[in-house]
A protein has these predicted regions:
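Metal-dependent catalytic neighborhoods of phosphoester/phosphodiester hydrolases
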Residues: 142-152, 292-294
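Cap/insert and terminal regions of metallo-dependent hydrolase folds
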Residues: 106-117, 230-308
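Metallo-beta-lactamase
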Residues: 110-124, 128-140, 156-214, 264-277
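Active-site metal-binding loops of divalent metal-dependent hydrolases
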Residues: 41-43, 92-95, 137, 167-168, ...
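Intrinsic disorder/low-complexity segments
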Residues: 1-27
């Protein structure tokens, strides 16, 4: 496990976006030196009430209808970023280590999508991945970074450096009673023992034009990814705003440790996203890949829903 001090990189790169006419297709876009792909790793289902906190079901169900168990369908979408000789993943999905009972509880579905098959579509194997940026260590974000080989737990991406914030890693190893079910030992121990975990201290420009931004409302030390050049910005906001239905500021998950912190973080980041026309990638929305927002008469609203 390696700790790294903060540093700066002021390189700028010329770039442009490539948009598709049809929504909900997983294609690609280019920002500067980065070719960016959005990959599906699987689907799962979570309680709609928990996903929207204090917001009444009569409101959230208009956007996200629930099943007979009050669950809404969730995606687990990750970024694949190709840059020079680097092949970078942002998050890794839930993985395939769940016992049958938990698979049933969460309605895990890998029939349509999985991380490995999504990588294969880009002619990549796990051994090709050089870097894995983990926004945080909840099971649906980190589980795919490890796998079972018989009874042995090992890294899915054995040659990759895995990046986690120091404050979050410490929290993940000693979580609260409220969130400890989200941190599974089988997801953390292989990383801890691998020698391929790099602990980061705060916000930084990890690669030229690729910035890590901190959020502390959903969990302590969550790192979001912003990729930008002189013209365009992509914002992978992880669980700060998991779906398009969470654009209204008070629409905050019941899972969040510090909802008032989430409220202020959403206000700050979404205001900037609105002013600067960011493309916001939605990790958990099963129907919408990315959005741009605008200021409506009373609140921030979705201006357009986009495919990448």
């Amino acid at each position: 496990m390696e700790h790294e001090d903060d540093d700066e990189n002021d390189d700028e790169n010329e770039c442009k976006f490539h948009f598709l006419a049809k929504p909900l297709e997983f294609e690609s876009m280019k920002i500067g030196p980065y070719q960016i792909h959005l990959l599906e790793t699987g689907r799962f289902w979570l309680d709609g009430g928990a996903m929207f906190g204090v917001v009444p079901k009569t409101l959230w169900s208009q956007e996200k209808p629930s099943d007979e168990k009050n669950r809404i369908e969730m995606s687990m979408k990750v970024l694949l970023i190709l840059y020079e000789d680097r092949k970078i993943l942002v998050d890794a999905g839930a993985g395939h280590k769940f016992p049958p009972k938990l698979q049933e509880i969460y309605g895990l579905d890998y029939q349509r999508f999985s991380l490995k098959t999504s990588l294969q579509a880009h002619r990549l194997q796990p051994v090709d991945i050089t870097d894995v940026i983990l926004t945080h260590c909840h099971f649906d974000h980190v589980g795919g970074a490890t796998e079972r080989d018989g009874e042995v737990l090992q890294l899915t991406f054995p040659k990759a450096t895995h990046y986690v914030q120091d404050s979050h890693w410490n929290w993940a190893l000693s979580p609260s009673e409220k969130d400890r079910a989200s941190f599974l030992k089988e997801n953390l121990e292989p990383l801890k023992q691998s020698g391929r975990l790099k602990i980061l201290l705060g916000e930084r420009e990890l690669f030229p034009g690729l910035h890590l931004l901190l959020s502390n409302g959903h969990t302590v030390g969550l790192q979001m990814v912003k990729i930008q050049d002189s013209t365009n910005t992509l914002f992978y906001c992880s669980d700060l705003m998991p779906t398009a239905a969470h654009v209204p500021l008070p629409y905050i998950m019941g899972y969040d440790l510090y909802p008032l912190t989430t409220l202020e973080e959403k206000r700050r980041y979404l205001s900037q996203a609105c002013d600067e026309n960011w493309l916001i990638v939605l990790e958990h929305d099963a129907e919408v890949d990315a959005i741009r927002i605008e200021q409506g008469e009373k609140r921030l609203e979705i201006r357009e829903k986009l495919a990448i």
